[in-house]
Amino acid sequence: MMMTKQKNSLAERLNIGEEVRELKLGATFNPKNTSTAFHTIKYDFKPASVDTSRMASVDVGSNNQVTVTVPNSESSGVPHTVYKGNQREYAKECLMIYDKETGAITIEKLNHNIQVKKTRNEVTNKSVQLPGQNMGQPHNQGANGAAPVAVPVPGQGSGTAPKMENSTMRISTKTKVSTGSRRNNIIDFKPRNSPMQQNSPSRPVPVHRSPQSAPAWDANNAQQTLPSIPLITDDDDFGLRAALHNSGHGNTSGTAAGQPDFGSTSSSTHIGKQRQAPPHGHGKRQQMHQRLSPPMAQQQQPSNYGRGYNGGHNHAQQQQHHQRNSPQQQRPSAYGHGNSMPIDVDSSREHELTSQSVAQAAAALEQQIGGALSASSSSSESDSSDSDSGSDSDDSTEDDRSTQGQQQDHQQQQQQQHQVYQNHKHTQQQVAQQHHNQLPNLGLGSISPAYGSSHQQQHQQQMLPHQQKQKQQSGIYASNGGFPNDFLQNDLQLSSNSSDDDDD
């Protein structure tokens, strides 16, 4: 039943009756034929927009590569469709040609079988550029009737169906891979610019390094180098005054605050320049005290020393005044152990100066005592010459009174000299104590006690020959403040002789 229906349908379709027809062999069976050839082309997909009124082109390349270009209708928007594939030769396949006009049937051999597939270049480009249009293409093709055409075309050959499925699967896999890669790229791209990676431990390492190095060096160096600027220059008086003022008031606080370099340099300059200045300032002050020879002026001298002892700041101001008057300024060479030698040299200079000043004061006192004694002797002689009694007892009483007055004056002068010596010794101890307080961190703490003791010993050694010399030069008064017997006897003899002369 099925066969008859197919035959009937084929006979009806070709308009062939049940009669027997003659079959002719075509030119392809002729071995000398070189101009006629028949080929078959199988497409995996034929779009509905193909324009059948125009000719297609076939290009055969090397290695049996074939490119078929089929024109499309103008309404499709695509000028042509390109197919690419390969060819292979037939061995036993033939082609039967039926001529409707004559009714003749001819058999021809097939030379090559060409199988091509539609290239996905344009479609892939569209999928990459405009993915929305590719999603809408199956609906348009279904509306135009292209989808039913695509279904039976794979049925023409057994090998074309898996190829079509593979092609669609490849496209889907490509889109999946592309979307997956895009998602992966987006996932990888977000952490790169995300704040989580900015706060990662790899980047804060240089951020933590820069604050640890920069403030430690800049702050410490600035604090250590700034105070040393006025100490370097020799001509800067303002820097020296500031250094002396700071050393006089806050050396101990500066060293306790953690600046040993500044305290040591300022104190060293204070000591070095304090000991350079006294040749001018201290000498002038001693000359001023020597000029005030009366006892009242000498009594003012201990009061000045007492004021200097009570107010340490006045002594520092006097030292600054002496430093301004001093023409020589030396740079402090002292860092470390080099301070011990200049201190010993300066201390010896101060001892010499103080000894000279004490010697000058003692000489002035000797001159005053000598003048007072000469005046008393002259007055006693005048009194003895004017007296008419002539008695030795009256002369002796007058001489005793004059000698007692001189002894009292001499005792007062000795007490004043002793007070001057004690006040001077006290001020020297005060200066030594100030030096000891100003040098807490120089390692010179052991020098100041030795300095005070050596100062006292040297002063005592220098005062002993001076006292001996004073005793030898004076020779006028005894050790207890009175006059010796020889002088009294000579005075009595002179008074008696003068009285005898008056009697004669």
UniProtKB/Swiss-Prot annotation:
GO function terms (MF aspect): transcription elongation factor activity
Composition bias, Acidic residues: 383-398
Modified residue annotations for Phosphoserine: 194
Pfam families: EAF
Family that this chain belongs to: Belongs to the EAF family.
Record keywords: Activator, Developmental protein, Nucleus, Phosphoprotein, Transcription, Transcription regulation
Transmembrane segments: none
Disruption of the gene: reported phenotype: Loss of adult progeny and reduced male-female sex ratio.
Gene name of the record: Eaf
Organism annotation: Drosophila melanogaster
Region Disordered: start-end pairs: 174-218, 242-504
Function: Promotes transcriptional elongation by Su(Tpl)/ELL. Essential for development.
Listed GO biological process terms: cellular response to heat; positive regulation of DNA-templated transcription; transcription elongation by RNA polymerase II; wound healing
Cell location: Nucleus
Protein name, UniProt field: Ell-associated factor Eaf
